[in-house]
Amino acid sequence: MAYKLILAAFAATALAAPVEERQSCSNGVWAQCGGQNWSGTPCCTSGNKCVKLNDFYSQCQPGSAEPSSTAAGPSSTTATKTTATGGSSTTAGGSVTSAPPAASDNPYAGVDLWANNYYRSEVMNLAVPKLSGAKATAAAKVADVPSFQWMDTYDHISLMEDTLADIRKANKAGGKYAGQFVVYDLPNRDCAAAASNGEYSLDKDGANKYKAYIAKIKGILQNYSDTKVILVIEPDSLANLVTNLNVDKCAKAESAYKELTVYAIKELNLPNVSMYLDAGHGGWLGWPANIGPAAKLYAQIYKDAGKPSRVRGLVTNVSNYNGWKLSTKPDYTESNPNYDEQRYINAFAPLLAQEGWSNVKFIVDQGRSGKQPTGQKAQGDWCNAKGTGFGLRPSTNTGDALADAFVWVKPGGESDGTSDTSAARYDYHCGLDDALKPAPEAGTWFQAYFEQLLDNANPSFL
């Protein structure tokens, strides 16, 4: 999958060249005006006020009140880097009741996560045989880490059915497992890039084909109503509508993306299901020029769908590399204040609440975020980035009330996109200096990348 991050010049402009005098303050509406490590001036242009959203982020919002020096000023507190203890591959234990959880409940609490056989077979049959000794032993441990299973084509829906059958069998034997899956087949998919273009096109009845795809998923979920399922909904799609409508393919897909996302979450609003809409990552939508419009869009989708009770919140950092809580700001994040995922979700949640989506919760992909900083030259370099490692294991022990769990959405070792410039799905990001090459097509096994993740894993598998 791909994140074509066109972080437009206005994003940088919103943070650039702060002036000293209040009367000439350049921090306009939705710009940052304070927070931890903020080096600019704590002021806003006329007609706006500086509002503290959290310790990390204060923002200029419409209003005439004068900014508070305590709300807007930079904090002297320094965040510490989170390190995990042990190598547990499941969430905290507990019992699963026969009744579905309330919408306010964390779906990750009280269950174990299922390590699906598809990823296990990739690791055991493709990765391990090419390794030896301690490294082969370490690689085999990766197969035990629960990751999401991607339904990136209609035909791959059957893999979910197979996995749910395995889970039901294990649960009848006394287990308490939940399955994790990604819904990822919108028509005109991956509109701002090429690496993960999908099977449906809007000009070839793609909308109706997508509805049939959703109907197939719904039927299976209803057949397994006794099994808890967690869904990630359409990586990249809505985020592209925030930043990439200047791309013709995205502009043409805008209304369909919105309508079909609403359709999907309404149809899949089942008692045994919990859903998280994909919301990019801090290096994409976390920029001050993007985070306000993003909150409006996501809240509107949620409201247009009738505020489905099984939509728990948002997932961030899918297939990306951002750390959760960093003590040092990586150079490649430039002036972005929300350069790690904890800062991002804590800046995002209050804005969503203002737009009508309150009590939103998050899950955060940390599957490839173990090495910080990475080898990226820009935070938007999404394709097979060098210098990355397996990260924090799936867990509900996040230390933040907004974060339900750390998860592995992207199966580590599957390629982000091909580096073959002659390929139909070649994207230039996969040919950048900071992308590992040669790389196969998106979704296919990339042994060299798996070994990089294993070598740099934090916590280590060795």
Curated annotation (Swiss-Prot):
Residues 100-462 are annotated as: Catalytic. Residues 64-100 have a biased composition (Low complexity). Disulfide bonds join 33-50, 44-60, 191-250, 383-430. Pfam families: CBM_1 (PF00734), Glyco_hydro_6 (PF01341). Residues 66-99 are annotated as: Linker. It catalyses: Endohydrolysis of (1->4)-beta-D-glucosidic linkages in cellulose, lichenin and cereal beta-D-glucans. InterPro entries: Beta_cellobiohydrolase, Beta_cellobiohydrolase_sf, CBD_sf, Cellulose-bd_dom_fun, Glyco_hydro_6_CS. One of its GO terms (cellular component) is extracellular region. GO terms for biological process: cellulose catabolic process. This is Putative endoglucanase type B.
